[in-house]
C-alpha cells in the first residue's frame, strides 16, 4: 500500500498476538468493545500528524477485520471516506448458524443468540447499525468460504445499496477465506486500489 502512496495504520489492537494470551482473548464476547476503541484511538492519534490528510482516510479489513469494517461503518462519526471489507461477518446471528466451525462462534460469541447471556455480544452485530451507514463501501468475498459464508458479504452489499450508499461487490466463485489463485490476486489488487483511489485521491 505504501508504494501506492498510502500511509498504513495497523494497530496491535485487542485480539492480536502481540501482548500475550490475555490480550489475544480480550475480544471474545466483546466484539464491538475495547478492540474498536483501540482502532479509533490509533487512527485519531495518527490523524494528528502533519503528514496525514484526515479528510482522506480509508478503512480496510479482512475476516475479523471485515467484521470491524462493517461495525465501524455504523460508528465512525465521519472519520473515514471509504471502506473495504473482505470476508467479514455482517450479521452475527446468521453467522452463528452458517459457519462450519462451531467451536469458534461458541467461544468468541459466547454461544447461540437465543441464549440471554449472549445478548450484549449479538447487540454488536454490524447489521443492527446499517441505519447509520453513510460511506462508500466495497465488499469482497470468496464463494467457497465456509468459515464466513458469502451470504454475509451479499447481505452487507445489499444493505448499502438499499441505503443508497455507493457500493461495489466482488465475489470470487473459486476462492475461500483467502484469495490464492494468481489471476484472482491480480484482480483483487486492481479492484482494491481502484476503489481506494476513487474515493481517497
Predicted regions and their residues:
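Active-site-proximal cap/loop segments of hydrolase catalytic domains
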Residues: 2-4, 10-201
